[in-house]
Amino acid sequence: MRFVIVTGLSGAGKSQAIRSLEDLGYFCVDNLPPTLMGKFAEACYQTDGKIDKIALVIDIRGGEFFDDLFENLKYLKEQNYRYEILFLDASDKVLVKRYKESRRTHPLAPGGRLIQGIELERRRLNEVKYKANNIIDTSNMTQMQLREKIWRIYGDDEQIENRLIIDVLSFGFKYGIPVDADLVFDVRFLPNPYYIPELKQFSGDDKEIQDYVLGFKETKEFIAKLDDMLKFLIPNYIKEGKIQLVVAIGCTGGRHRSVTIANAIYDRLKEKGHKVSKEHRDINEDIKKGGRKL
């Protein structure tokens, strides 16, 4: 089990760090009182491997509970619960700027000067910082750069290589464009098998429709161009820290052309080793509604 304790200065990026760990599959808990760490770790270890990655945020917001941190870390060590500490730091100047922009009050300076609260927190956390396994100074980092750093430290090789999840979704424009789509492609320019009586009953999951739709020159050219575009976009999305990409392909009813193209794109992405899923949102909508309204 990998047990990460995330701590550090207020405003240094702990929230972004815990979100990044959550994206890596860690079971995350924010602001857990240190007095509960032992019981929490024990409960996780008793899941027989169902929970194998844990991340806890423990910071100065815990008030007097924070003073019990070292005693509880000692208890974890005595019980052979292996843990590592990630400490988020930033310069006073950057922390002041971030607090001014967010218009939040510092937990140790609710009624006093911000810089005094930062200095007090830095002194109180000095010993924790000394014990940290990893220290990340976020002073000159963007959120994406911090996420990248977290992924490199706490993600495994497979996660780093295949961190982008691609969802290929077919849909019918008559039923609305998917609200979560990142890329939308309209394939209504392709010949429509709906108007071929002997094909109308089938869907893009059937060979009859696939042979018809994929048999046209325009279809082959479109798939090749879309494949080439995704080949360019995917590594750039990964570079920017994107973890999910929804590629939506639409035709009129979402049963024939869009399903066929979505299947073809899904197969190509799968062959290239991408982490990809597919969904045909509206494939049965026309049938459920008793036929298509023109």
Curated annotation (Swiss-Prot):
Keyword Cell cycle attributed: no
Signal sequence residues: none
Keywords: ATP-binding, GTP-binding, Nucleotide-binding
SUPFAM superfamilies associated with the record: P-loop containing nucleoside triphosphate hydrolases
Binding site for GTP: D59, I60, R61, G62
UniProt-listed Pfam families: PapZ_C, RapZ-like_N
Record GO terms (molecular function): ATP binding; GTP binding
Gene3D superfamilies per the UniProt record, alphabetical: P-loop containing nucleotide triphosphate hydrolases
Superkingdom classification of source: Bacteria
Binding positions for ATP per the UniProt entry: G8, L9, S10, G11, A12, G13, K14, S15
KW Cell cycle (keyword) present: no
Entry-linked PANTHER family: RNASE ADAPTER PROTEIN RAPZ
Family per similarity comment: Belongs to the RapZ-like family.
Protein purpose: Displays ATPase and GTPase activities.
Protein name, UniProt field: Nucleotide-binding protein NT01CX_1284
